Amino acid sequence: MFQNNFNKNFVVVNNQALNGRSSKSFIDEGKWANVKKLIKKGDYVLIQFGHNDAKTDTARHTIPGSTFDQYLKQYASETLKLGGIPVLMSPCARRKWKNGVLVDSHGDYRLRAKVVAKSLNVHYIDANAITEKLEKQLGEEGSKKLHLIYAAGEKASYPNGVEDNIM
């Protein structure tokens, strides 16, 4: 979706994100090493984690204010070293509603990218605030269109339905 906001004649978006990865597992699986090979001088590198870092499995878990910050610093520092321009981003808001109120599900992870960006003097985008505002504007029912949510039989590729939010 992000890449659809740019004129393809002027901006190339090379999305290397992978579902389910944390700041730790993306490095441990060698995915970051592959991305580094692609970074050229002047490239903007958008770095967004936190969505899966709170998972309890040791392959993905990081600690905000500690290991999570260390990984974000590694991404940003290595991007700078390669001549790229790192942009740290907070995680997008999850669709988690309780009694008609959107509930934060990222805790301290949502704040750490800002802290790290400031400490390194690099760019920062508060994707959590932007997406949280959009979720709230659309409301609990309307925000479904932002997510992978289909009832059984509604979409051929998901015959049994699918719901990717946290309720």
For each of these PLM feature ranges, what is it?
Residues 17-20, 50:
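Glycine-centered flexibility sites
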